[in-house]
């Protein structure tokens, strides 16, 4: 076992020291001297969250299958250790070798959520790597960003040497080959980055320059050199059944957010909800063969000792082989004490039958995500869920023994009116009425309905990327309308209402659609002590307000205005496969309250067919 980077004295004074010692079950062990490339894979949040992330496990497995690469892991130190490392000048280290990140060739950071941006700076700072890419030395690691937030990398572009746009299974081989060649030729860091910019899916921010108009919008976004492409096209794994997948995932030492075998059975979504970024950037839908999934289930349970299988997908019910897969898992593993988790199911007879087999009905809740209370607003957002379907599904569930329902909605959606807000409470009441229509002797106790509302944040590459947002007071006012409406309902005692923090929503909106001018404010927030901003107990909105003011940033510019259709967005240089023409058409259909059929019902010509596979080609021979 390697010598630990932290002394016993430190480990005994911090919370959950097992976060930092490595050596877990299935951890890959190599001699760093035997490889050409050392890659530190980072999730910029605490160990328990990072260890639950499937994407990290996939890349960790894929990289370590190579003889020339050693991939190790690193997560954000909790604030108690952060303070000690700063005081004692201890450099951040990888779990496997316990060696400093600054000695690696690459530091890859997956970026899943905008509120983790300050943790990216924490990782760089504790690693003793210059936070600004322009200030890095020749022997510093190449810092790579990836994940969904890289579809608008501009607010954090100054901190990264390059971004990988798309799914990680595709272009890393070419990047590693180039890196080894450049090292052999002893070319400069800048020359490596310039050559890397020509690799499909690789975006090198320093190779592009941005000009702005007097009104603050972007005038142009252009490459600095002729051999640097003007457009960066996302990379996508089309053959899901033969793609790399971790049969021996690392098992955390302490309880993580998800200690389960995760079976990813498809990527993408056919539904086309107009607010949903994942539904657009992961197009087209691609399925994994059920026989492959059966093999993974056996192997991963055997290799981990986990007692739960979780199915991973944006919309589980749309998987064409779902019934066969679920019945296989139930028949082969339920009697062995293995729980089966089925998220993202539509509530219909099949789903209720399945959930009745795998869940304790008396303890579990039924989850609906109508997103909007009224049918009008559900049409605006293209949520293919009618009130009739919701009430019928709830009725079948209640008759099957359920009595707990969770409802998820968004406030602040485009075209929303007060009637739409009140409709949230009215829908919850109708569900309660449906429960109490069941004879008393057949009910399972009292009905419990929980309403949760988040505030809508427009995201890049969605039809709502042109939409405006609102300020904190407006969001809280909308939540009050819903809260007051709940109190007016006949079954109000059966309804509980929760809502999201408005300050965080506004910040998410600034960061989600921001540009390079946001970076100085991020640095200021970190300098003021901002880390773990995704955690309520550490988030301090005043830091952000002060930082934006000190940097002269008008936050309303990023949140409070509807964008004209011809505005150049910071992310327009990325080709994610879905055309801007399609997004504009969907934005206009939303305003007309028109519903667009899902991909299996009718192709809408979004552009994803260019990838020549998946759902786009299901009916073509």
What residue ranges belong to the model's regions?
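Conserved SAM/AdoMet-binding glycine-rich loop
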Residues: 41-42, 46, 115, 298-406, ...
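N-terminal [4Fe-4S]-dependent radical SAM core
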Residues: 10-40, 47-48, 205, 211-262, ...
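Short secondary-structure boundary/capping segments
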Residues: 56, 88, 124, 158-163, ...
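Canonical Radical SAM [4Fe-4S] cluster-binding loop centered on the CxxxCxxC motif
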Residues: 53, 255-291, 602-620
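Glycine-rich beta-alpha loop elements in corrinoid/cobalamin-binding modules
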Residues: 77-222, 463-515, 522-537
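Radical SAM enzyme core and accessory elements
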Residues: 1-28, 39-41, 488-621
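A short beta-strand-loop structural module common to alpha/beta enzyme folds
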Residues: 67-80
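N-terminal pre-triad scaffold of radical SAM enzymes
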Residues: 41-45, 63, 249-277, 301, ...
């Amino acid at each position: 076992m390697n010598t630990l980077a932290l002394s016993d004295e430190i480990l005994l004074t911090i919370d959950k020291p097992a976060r930092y010692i490595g050596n877990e079950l299935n951890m890959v062990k190599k001699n760093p001297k035997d490889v050409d490339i050392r890659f530190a894979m980072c999730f910029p949040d605490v160990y328990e969250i990072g260890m639950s992330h499937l994407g990290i496990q996939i890349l960790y497995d894929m990289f370590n299958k190579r003889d020339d690469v050693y991939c190790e892991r690193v997560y954000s130190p909790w604030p108690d250790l952060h303070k000690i490392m700063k005081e004692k000048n201890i450099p951040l280290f990888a779990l496997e070798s316990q060696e400093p990140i600054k000695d690696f060739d690459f530091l890859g950071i997956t970026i899943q959520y905008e509120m983790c941006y300050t943790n990216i700076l924490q990782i760089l700072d504790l690693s003793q790597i210059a936070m600004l890419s322009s200030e890095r030395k020749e022997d510093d690691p190449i810092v790579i960003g990836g994940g969904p937030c890289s579809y608008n990398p501009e607010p954090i572009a100054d901190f990264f040497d390059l971004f990988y746009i798309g799914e990680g299974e595709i272009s890393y081989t070419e990047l590693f080959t180039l890196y080894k060649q450049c090292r052999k030729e002893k070319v400069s860091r800048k020359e490596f980055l310039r050559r890397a910019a020509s690799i499909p899916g690789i975006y090198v921010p320093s190779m592009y320059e941005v000009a702005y108009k007097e009104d603050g919008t972007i005038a142009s976004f252009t490459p600095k050199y002729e051999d640097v492409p003007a457009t960066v096209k996302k990379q996508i794994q089309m053959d899901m059944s033969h793609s790399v997948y971790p049969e021996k995932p690392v098992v955390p030492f302490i309880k993580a957010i998800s200690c389960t075998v995760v079976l990813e059975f498809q990527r993408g979504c056919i539904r086309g909800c107009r607010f949903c970024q994942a539904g657009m950037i992961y197009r087209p839908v691609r399925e994994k063969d059920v026989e492959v999934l059966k093999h993974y289930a056996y192997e991963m349970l055997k290799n981990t000792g986990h007692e739960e299988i979780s199915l991973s997908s944006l919309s589980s019910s749309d998987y064409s082989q779902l019934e066969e897969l679920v019945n296989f898992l139930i028949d082969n593993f339920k009697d062995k004490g293995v729980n089966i988790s089925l998220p993202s199911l539509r509530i219909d007879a099949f789903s209720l039958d399945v959930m009745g087999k795998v869940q304790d009905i008396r303890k579990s809740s039924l989850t609906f995500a109508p997103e909007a209370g009224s049918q009008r607003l559900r049409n605006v957002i293209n949520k293919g869920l009618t009130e009739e379907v919701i009430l019928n599904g709830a009725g079948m569930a209640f008759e099957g023994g359920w009595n707990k329902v969770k409802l998820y909605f968004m406030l602040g959606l485009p075209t929303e009116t007060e009637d739409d807000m009140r409709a949230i409470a009215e829908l919850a009441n109708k569900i309660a009425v449906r429960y109490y229509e069941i004879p008393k002797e057949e009910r399972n106790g009292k009905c419990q309905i929980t309403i949760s509302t988040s505030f809508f944040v427009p995201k890049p590459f969605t039809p709502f990327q042109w939409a405006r947002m609102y300020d904190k007071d407006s969001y809280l006012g909308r939540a009050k309308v819903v809260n007051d409406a709940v109190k007016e309902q006949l079954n109000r005692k059966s309804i509980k209402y929760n809502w999201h923090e408005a300050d965080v929503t506004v910040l998410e909106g600034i960061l989600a659609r921001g540009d390079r001018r946001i970076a100085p404010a991020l640095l200021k927030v970190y300098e003021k002590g901002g880390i773990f901003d995704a955690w309520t107990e550490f988030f301090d909105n005043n830091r952000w307000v002060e930082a934006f003011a000190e940097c002269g940033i008008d936050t309303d510019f990023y949140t409070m205005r509807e964008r004209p259709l011809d505005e150049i967005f910071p992310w327009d240089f990325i080709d994610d496969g879905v055309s801007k023409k399609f997004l504009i058409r969907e934005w206009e259909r939303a305003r007309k309250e028109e519903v667009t059929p899902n991909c299996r019902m009718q192709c809408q010509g979004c552009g994803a067919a260019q990838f020549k596979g998946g759902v786009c080609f299901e009916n073509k021979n």
